[in-house]
A protein has these predicted regions:
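A short, N-terminal "cap"/entry segment at the start of jelly-roll beta-barrel domains
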Residues: 1-33, 41-43, 63-65, 70-84, ...
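Residue-level "contact hotspot" at macromolecular interaction interfaces
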Residues: 35, 54, 71-74, 171
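Hydrophobic alpha-helical transmembrane segments of multi-pass integral membrane proteins
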Residues: 44, 179-180
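Short, conserved beta-strand element in jelly-roll/cupin
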Residues: 46-62, 144, 151-167, 171
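Loop/turn positions that initiate beta-strands
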Residues: 78-79, 170, 174-176
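Noncatalytic accessory or regulatory domains flanking protease catalytic cores in secreted, cell-surface
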Residues: 88, 176-178
Length: 197
């Protein structure tokens, strides 16, 4: 008998999977920072809710669902996708670099939020680019130079990025002014949450 290379008899909740680090949890979302080293694999885990995934850096993985065939996936820096609830799988990093991403679970209450308008540049040099727009969330890329500032409205998650991962992640309530706190350009991702007006 051939042994399953991706055993999934024992399934853990995503928050108990050690490569998924829970960084924000509230009534609307749970946000995880994920890092899987080359050759490493996750425990078999369950995604109970729809989720957005933003990829940091290039990566190659095998996603092996509990009931289905393993599939090789290639991601590029900045890829963003929405996945439906219910996936139970093992993820194996078959690439040569760490597979890093930010995963935001959309809890049922997120539908009660009203999404604010897109960020408004209020100073300096800022480029805002939409990379995902859906019914319950919008994901935007922000490139901010040292003098750059943007104003946001509504509930959101602000993620500042480094070349090799996440520098900071924070939950925003209501109006906020975001700026570059460095003498070099800053790359950030903004997850705006809730339904559109």
């Amino acid at each position: 008998m051939v042994q399953d290379p991706y055993p999934c008899e024992h399934v853990v909740p995503i928050e108990q999977e050690p490569r998924h680090r829970l960084v924000i949890a509230n009534d609307f979302i749970r946000a995880f920072v994920i890092e899987i080293l080359p050759g490493d694999r996750t425990l078999c885990h369950r995604h109970e809710h729809d989720y957005l995934m933003y990829v940091i850096g290039d990566g190659e993985i095998v996603s092996a669902p509990r009931y289905g065939e393993p599939g090789k996936l290639t991601y590029r820096n900045g890829d963003c996708e929405l996945s439906s609830a219910g996936l139970v799988h093992v993820v194996n990093n078959v690439g040569t670099t760490p597979f890093r991403n930010v995963l935001v679970e959309l809890l049922p209450a997120v539908g009660e939020l009203q999404r604010g308008a897109e960020p408004r540049v209020i100073g300096g040099d800022v480029t805002v680019k939409a990379i995902f727009k859906g019914e319950l969330a919008c994901v935007l890329s922000l490139e901010m130079h040292p003098d750059g500032q943007v104003e946001t409205l509504g509930e959101a998650i602000f993620v500042t990025l480094l070349v090799d991962g996440v520098r900071d992640i924070s939950w925003i309530l209501g109006r906020a002014v975001l700026g570059c706190d460095s003498d070099r350009p800053l790359r950030a991702i903004l997850f705006q949450l809730g339904r559109t007006h």
